Structures are given as structure tokens and as C-alpha cells.
């Protein structure tokens, strides 16, 4: 229910703001009244909320808690809309665990200066690439015509509603590492399948019935995900931040919990991938690379797969910078590069999205958020 006691007056209030989230008229400030009203509502057939669901379907995690805490018995009802929501994260047997994903800042974009965090929900489908798993994000819903001043003002003052959304993970990888040249750090969390289901059911409760105000420095993506994660792992005590929390601090807070993170992987942005590839070239190969991208060397005369891979990554990077388009001359050179690279055979490093690797993990420690300096804590 996300109740917190606010200083200096000691007011107890839920951070959830939509009225449909509460059954009692004073439920946002009175947990006992809300518990009694919830226990009654779960035995009613009256549809509630924007989706006109039975209360058991609208609040599946609260329903589970009330049954266990109060020892009550109910006639349970089918929940087809909820079932469809959960099925997108994997079925038979379903979602297995959660990975916290941190994206670095986008160059020349002040709105991304603190980075961004979201979850990848890991399914248990054998043989399926993790790129086909679903991402779960929390972000402000801002009208597209809001200018920068309005955007920053409303973001600072909680003028936007924050909402959860889902998207296939490969689209998130493409968005961040290709289109925006942002590194991705992945932290697999030690959640059990049941704890993962708890997290998803609670995300459903908030998203289908209510919202939270979005603030850049506290009620942001990092805080919302911490609050969601704390429902699944209350023993981690994730949300008592003094005044603000930004994505990098969220990552550090979780990684400092013994046993919370079981694996760390890194997906470099296309720009980092290009920089790393160029560093592996010999002096002559670098001359050939620059000759190819400047149009001074015929790609069909190049015998080095490393040069062609680097040139292919460069043209792909330029294409992403220009909204997926290349000038005719660059597009022609790129086709020649890819044709020559294919003729040489062997594994190519051009095709995105890149899979994480130990080599990549060791190559970029400076961008790893959990190894960065601590922020100054206010409050």
C-alpha cells in the first residue's frame, strides 16, 4: 500500500494517489480502515476500476495478503485480463526472475543526465534469447507538446503521472545501445519465481487502478522500481531514502545488499563498440579503416575482417544518428563493406544487438554505476 509517515507532522499517507486504489474513503491515510474495506470488497461481485474487474482481479497481491493475514476464505473468481497481462512475461511455467537494467546518460540530453533504470522479466522458456523477454519500465507521461521549461517544472513539482509500461527487451536494447548510444548494465536479482510473480501482480495493481506522481529526484523511475521490488523483498528495506534517489544510487543500494545480485553483465552502446573495435586495429588497419569510411579506399580491396567490421559499425552508427537513414554515397559504401565482409566469412561483430560478454564487462568499469562515487545525501 506504500504508506509512509511524512515529516515534520508525522502524517501517515500512501504514495499511491488515484482514488480507485482504495476501498475506504479515508484509505489513503488510514491503513486499518483500508484493510477492513478490502476484506469486504474481496467478497463482493461489484466490478471496480477502469477495467471493470472483480476486486480479486484488480488487486491480486492485496487479495493474497488479506487471505493470509486475516485467515479469510473467499470464493475465487477467474481473472482473464490479469491472466493475459501475466502471460506476456512467459507462460508454462512463466516468469522466473528479475534483472535490474541501468542505462547511462545520453550525450547532449540533460533529461537523461542521471541515467534510467527498468526491469527485465526473465522467462523460463528453454532456448529463448533473453532479448525476447519483456521489459517493465516506469516513466512520466508527458504531453508531446510540452516545451523544455514546462517539462522541467512539472517534473520537479510532481505535475506528471508516472505509469508502468511493458516492451520486448530487444526493443529497449535497440533504443538505448543503438539509437541513443547509451550503455546498458544488467544486474540479475536473487528473486524466486514466486517473488517475481508478486512483483508483477503488484505492478498490475498500480497500473490498472491508479498512479503515482512523478518527480525527477524522488518519485522517479528508480524510486518506483524500488517500491515495487520491496513488495517482493520487504527484508531488503529499499525505500527509506532521506530526500531523493537517482538511478545510479538505486543500483548501489541494491548491490550492497548481501546476495541481492547474482550476476552482472554489460551491453556496450554502438559508440563504445566502435571505439573498442578501433583500438584493436593495427596502425595500417586504422589507416585502411579511415580510408574506407572517407571514401578513399575501395572496401572490396580490404582483406582485414577487423577493418570491415569497424567500418560496418561506423556506418551503422551514422545511420542511427540520422534516424535510420544514410546519404546515398554512405549507403553505397556500407553495402560494399557488408558484401566484402560476407565474402571473407567468419563471425562478424557488426550485427546488433550485441550480446553481453566478459570482455565487454572488463572494458568499461568507468561507466558501471555500482562502482561510482556516492552521492551527497540530503535530509
PLM feature spans:
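Activation targets extended, charge/polar-rich intrinsically disordered C-terminal tails
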Residues: 1-78, 187, 202-378
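N-terminal accessory/precursor segments of enzymes
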Residues: 151-222, 232
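Short linear interaction motifs
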Residues: 79-83, 93-103, 358-361
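Active-site-adjacent bridging/hinge elements
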Residues: 88-97, 110-112, 116, 192-203
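Active-site scaffold segments
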Residues: 117-120, 135-139, 188, 222-230
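Glycine-rich catalytic cores of cysteine/serine-nucleophile enzymes that process amide/ester linkages
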Residues: 94-181
Amino acid at each position: 500500500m506504500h504508506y509512509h509517515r511524512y515529516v515534520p507532522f508525522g502524517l501517515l499517507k500512501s504514495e499511491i494517489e488515484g482514488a480507485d486504489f482504495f476501498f475506504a474513503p479515508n484509505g489513503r491515510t488510514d491503513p486499518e480502515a483500508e484493510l477492513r474495506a478490502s476484506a469486504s470488497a474481496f467478497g463482493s461481485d461489484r466490478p471496480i476500476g477502469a477495467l471493470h474487474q472483480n476486486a480479486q482481479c484488480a488487486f491480486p497481491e492485496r487479495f493474497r495478503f488479506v487471505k493470509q493475514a486475516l485467515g479469510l476464505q473467499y470464493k475465487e473468481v477467474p481473472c482473464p485480463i490479469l491472466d493475459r497481462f501475466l502471460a506476456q512475461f512467459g507462460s508454462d511455467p512463466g516468469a522466473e526472475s528479475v534483472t535490474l537494467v541501468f542505462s547511462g546518460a545520453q550525450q547532449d540530453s540533460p533529461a537523461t543526465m542521471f541515467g534510467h533504470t527498468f526491469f527485465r522479466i526473465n522467462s523460463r522458456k528453454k532456448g529463448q534469447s533473453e532479448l525476447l523477454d519483456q521489459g517493465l519500465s516506469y516513466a512520466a507521461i508527458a504531453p508531446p507538446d510540452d516545451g523544455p521549461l514546462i517539462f522541467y517544472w512539472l517534473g520537479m513539482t510532481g505535475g506528471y503521472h508516472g505509469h508502468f509500461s511493458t516492451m520486448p527487451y530487444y526493443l529497449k536494447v535497440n533504443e538505448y545501445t543503438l539509437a541513443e548510444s547509451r550503455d546498458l548494465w544488467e544486474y540479475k536479482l536473487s528473486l524466486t519465481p514466486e517473488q517475481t510473480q508478486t512483483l508483477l501482480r503488484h505492478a498490475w495493481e498500480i497500473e490498472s487502478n491508479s498512479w503515482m506522481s512523478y518527480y525527477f529526484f524522488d518519485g522517479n523511475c528508480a524510486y518506483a522500481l524500488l517500491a515495487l521490488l520491496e513488495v517482493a523483498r520487504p527484508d531488503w528495506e529499499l525505500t527509506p531514502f532521506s530526500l531523493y534517489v537517482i538511478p545510479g544510487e538505486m543500483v548501489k543500494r541494491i548491490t550492497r545488499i548481501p546476495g541481492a545480485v547474482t550476476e552482472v553483465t554489460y551491453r556496450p552502446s554502438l559508440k563504445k563498440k566502435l571505439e573498442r573495435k578501433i583500438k584493436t586495429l593495427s596502425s595500417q588497419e586504422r589507416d585502411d579503416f579511415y580510408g574506407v569510411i572517407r571514401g578513399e579506399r575501395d572496401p572490396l580491396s580490404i582483406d582485414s575482417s577487423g577493418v570491415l567490421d569497424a567500418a560496418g559499425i561506423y556506418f551503422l552508427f551514422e545511420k542511427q544518428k540520422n534516424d535510420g537513414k544514410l546519404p546515398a554515397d554512405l549507403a553505397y559504401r556500407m553495402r560494399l563493406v557488408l558484401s566484402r565482409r560476407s565474402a571473407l566469412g567468419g563471425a562478424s561483430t557488426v550485427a546488433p544487438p550485441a550480446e553481453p560478454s566478459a570482455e565487454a564487462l572488463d572494458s568499461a568499469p568507468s561507466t558501471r554505476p555500482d562502482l561510482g562515487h556516492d552521492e551527497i545525501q540530503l535530509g
